[in-house]
């Protein structure tokens, strides 16, 4: 089961300066961490972009999703990261080791050197890079991020494993490609024109998400998903009122997850928190 969040490249379009734009992206990263999101996708919305576009959004989110002990290794000095200091700490359990089991905790690492005889050196936040055997059938290259299972710190005992990287990944791809993934699960578009999410309807979505996973797409301030996708509000409303009508733009459902909003504009980072908080409720 995979949980994915899709955000537009115009996400920070109303930010007054780079500091505020960075802080907004930090809130999105925090939401992804808190609600155990596996993948954050930045999809293009060039018509809605202003001063900071998809490259900025992707870079800041990638930086936030990188464990602090790897950031210096993974990122050089970049203009996009001028205000990275305002990003809130994510403190993912997979980074701190508090999510470990009896077989050891998973950590991200970066391959710093590929040697001979199937050995590689990996920076994984220990005092020094550690030397590990490359498992049979697993080929890694210098600079690649890898997953390491640490069973002991003193003395250091660890091994490379072919598991997904701990935390959430960040990528930049088209909305259609993200929806077409085999692990997309329930594909939900968020919009004020969608079906108001209620206690009655939440149960059905919760069961499907627990079984199949979920992909949730969000719009940008003053520019929701309908105009981004060339979908009319009437088409969205029709899919809500007519149970026989298909949801537009290849989604399974359009949901209004803040049905009684008290502000004219809901910011994307606010919508992400409200939506994920609702969809991850348990009985």
Swiss-Prot record:
Pfam families attached to this UniProt entry: Methyltrn_RNA_3 (PF02598)
Top-level taxon: Archaea
InterPro entries: Alpha/beta_knot_MTases, NA-bd_OB-fold, Put_MeTrfase-C9orf114-like, tRNA_m1G_MTases_N
Designated name of the protein: Uncharacterized protein VNG_1688C
